[in-house]
């Protein structure tokens, strides 16, 4: 009991001491500020309990004159501080300083000599205009520096000298117009660099070479139009790069190959018009690829994404013109699990595209204008265990009988196994105005089964076939037409035609050069009778005009009959020879060709012709039969002789001039309506009642070279 008063005195003493210390700390805390222990993460993401002084958003004009001695984090965000004058009183253990959203106009107004323990400094959203030499020299332990959203237009070559431990540097959203590699010579340990939203316009080779440990680079929104081949040289540890919101019109393939350890690539929101063969290939560590929000992207071509053994995810969404993905676009991607293709202009996705991805687990193709026909029927054939994301948003747009139905609810047997080609309306515009001597690329893509072949027709009626160079024109195998150094002479209406065994589709574009529109020069239109039989007439035509549309209308009338009703056929304007069949013997016909122009007018010319009698035609047929037998016999003889020598003969083409021609020896007449029946139905807009005369188009030969 004697010790009780002593214990009471001791406890009272301790309590008084604690109260005194608490009172001292409360006095040290700046007025209106909050001083407390808060959780905090270091730049290395290490969690700690830090003594924090929170003076945010108090309208302070000056830096606090006094701070608790144990302060570790000082928050002065959203005040009106223009300079720091009491740096000598800084707590020695201060590790984090937030001066963002103040009125600092110069780093020289921040005396950092007593802040050697600082790890993080936030200076964003101030009024800094430059970073002079050695402006932060005293911060030898600094790991994070945020100078983004200022007015920086100049950074001295040695501005970052002394910051050899810096890990993160944020310079985005300033007024920098160039990148100087000397900035980075003092930053050997930098891992994250943000340079986006500066009016830099271009970067140079070796710009980032000193940054040997850089892991993440963001150069978004700087209006880049190209990336030099050696721009990323030296970045052997780079794992992530973002080119978001620039003006790249093609993938910087060569430059990306220099970043050998790249894992995450962001090319979103660039006007890249197509992903070409080999654009993303042999990038052995790439895991995620983003090609979203590209306003000009039309297609992903064959082998565009190839041999990426570690790729897990592709995002190609919200591309309003992306209408075509080649069946072999994604190749040798053994670990790809997620394929995001929603909200594009895709009418179909080939089954071959999915079959080439053995580890695919989920796919998103909703919010696309799906055409429910042969190309997409695989979805409902239970041939895949892939999960379709948001299946309730996957609807048919075409054909009319399925419009509005959910794709997964249309039975695959209701879709044809083969179907007409379809050129996406988004492939290219209907009118294009370009400057003289410029380079023009027109991207035409079509889906169908069997896969269609694509060729182009020039304003002068010449046919341009794939992989063929002709004057200023070159057509790529995928369907892209390149025109080099275009002049007003090459202006006019260009037509892309996609054909397969079922039929054809076409789409035209009017190209103006320097605002010049080709005028109707009333060029000549001539019809020539090439051959007359009892039941058919072979006619050809030639027109000197650059404004003709892509379809030609042939019409035949029986002159001896009162009725003027007649059936007609529409064909591509590059078909210069046409065979009218199923005619009556010894009958006079009026055959007319009607060619519309781009000015809603038409060129029309007619010719009168009388078919031969059956007797007269029979004699000629006999002669033709003899000639045919002789030709066949001679051909068999030649083949026999060649076989004796172990050679293989292949019959050459029988094409004459630039059009369909007659070859009675080698090629029998094939009805155009049998070869391309849907094509005739598609283009025939007449709703007339069937006439007594049946006129059908007949293809005499399929051209194999350019016109």
UniProtKB/Swiss-Prot annotation:
<keyword id="KW-0472">Membrane</keyword>
<dbReference type="InterPro" id="IPR007110">
    <property type="entry name" value="Ig-like_dom"/>
</dbReference>
<dbReference type="InterPro" id="IPR000483">
    <property type="entry name" value="Cys-rich_flank_reg_C"/>
</dbReference>
<feature type="repeat" description="LRR 8">
    <location>
        <begin position="237"/>
        <end position="258"/>
    </location>
</feature>
<feature type="signal peptide">
    <location>
        <begin position="1"/>
        <end position="22"/>
    </location>
</feature>
<dbReference type="InterPro" id="IPR032675">
    <property type="entry name" value="LRR_dom_sf"/>
</dbReference>
<keyword id="KW-0325">Glycoprotein</keyword>
<feature type="repeat" description="LRR 10">
    <location>
        <begin position="285"/>
        <end position="304"/>
    </location>
</feature>
<feature type="domain" description="LRRCT">
    <location>
        <begin position="368"/>
        <end position="421"/>
    </location>
</feature>
<dbReference type="InterPro" id="IPR003591">
    <property type="entry name" value="Leu-rich_rpt_typical-subtyp"/>
</dbReference>
<feature type="repeat" description="LRR 11">
    <location>
        <begin position="310"/>
        <end position="332"/>
    </location>
</feature>
<dbReference type="GO" id="GO:0031012">
    <property type="term" value="C:extracellular matrix"/>
</dbReference>
<feature type="topological domain" description="Extracellular">
    <location>
        <begin position="23"/>
        <end position="626"/>
    </location>
</feature>
<feature type="repeat" description="LRR 3">
    <location>
        <begin position="117"/>
        <end position="138"/>
    </location>
</feature>
<feature type="repeat" description="LRR 5">
    <location>
        <begin position="165"/>
        <end position="186"/>
    </location>
</feature>
<dbReference type="InterPro" id="IPR003599">
    <property type="entry name" value="Ig_sub"/>
</dbReference>
<feature type="topological domain" description="Cytoplasmic">
    <location>
        <begin position="648"/>
        <end position="707"/>
    </location>
</feature>
<feature type="disulfide bond">
    <location>
        <begin position="444"/>
        <end position="496"/>
    </location>
</feature>
<keyword id="KW-0393">Immunoglobulin domain</keyword>
<keyword id="KW-1133">Transmembrane helix</keyword>
<feature type="glycosylation site" description="N-linked (GlcNAc...) asparagine">
    <location>
        <position position="522"/>
    </location>
</feature>
<protein>
    <recommendedName>
        <fullName>Leucine-rich repeat neuronal protein 3</fullName>
    </recommendedName>
</protein>
<dbReference type="Pfam" id="PF13855">
    <property type="entry name" value="LRR_8"/>
</dbReference>
<feature type="glycosylation site" description="N-linked (GlcNAc...) asparagine">
    <location>
        <position position="608"/>
    </location>
</feature>
<feature type="repeat" description="LRR 7">
    <location>
        <begin position="213"/>
        <end position="234"/>
    </location>
</feature>
<feature type="glycosylation site" description="N-linked (GlcNAc...) asparagine">
    <location>
        <position position="579"/>
    </location>
</feature>
<dbReference type="InterPro" id="IPR050333">
    <property type="entry name" value="SLRP"/>
</dbReference>
<feature type="repeat" description="LRR 12">
    <location>
        <begin position="335"/>
        <end position="358"/>
    </location>
</feature>
<feature type="domain" description="Fibronectin type-III">
    <location>
        <begin position="523"/>
        <end position="614"/>
    </location>
</feature>
<keyword id="KW-0677">Repeat</keyword>
<dbReference type="Pfam" id="PF00041">
    <property type="entry name" value="fn3"/>
</dbReference>
<keyword id="KW-0433">Leucine-rich repeat</keyword>
<dbReference type="GO" id="GO:0005615">
    <property type="term" value="C:extracellular space"/>
</dbReference>
<feature type="repeat" description="LRR 9">
    <location>
        <begin position="261"/>
        <end position="282"/>
    </location>
</feature>
<feature type="glycosylation site" description="N-linked (GlcNAc...) asparagine">
    <location>
        <position position="382"/>
    </location>
</feature>
<feature type="repeat" description="LRR 6">
    <location>
        <begin position="189"/>
        <end position="210"/>
    </location>
</feature>
<dbReference type="InterPro" id="IPR000372">
    <property type="entry name" value="LRRNT"/>
</dbReference>
<dbReference type="InterPro" id="IPR013783">
    <property type="entry name" value="Ig-like_fold"/>
</dbReference>
<dbReference type="InterPro" id="IPR036179">
    <property type="entry name" value="Ig-like_dom_sf"/>
</dbReference>
<feature type="glycosylation site" description="N-linked (GlcNAc...) asparagine">
    <location>
        <position position="93"/>
    </location>
</feature>
<dbReference type="InterPro" id="IPR036116">
    <property type="entry name" value="FN3_sf"/>
</dbReference>
<dbReference type="GO" id="GO:0030131">
    <property type="term" value="C:clathrin adaptor complex"/>
</dbReference>
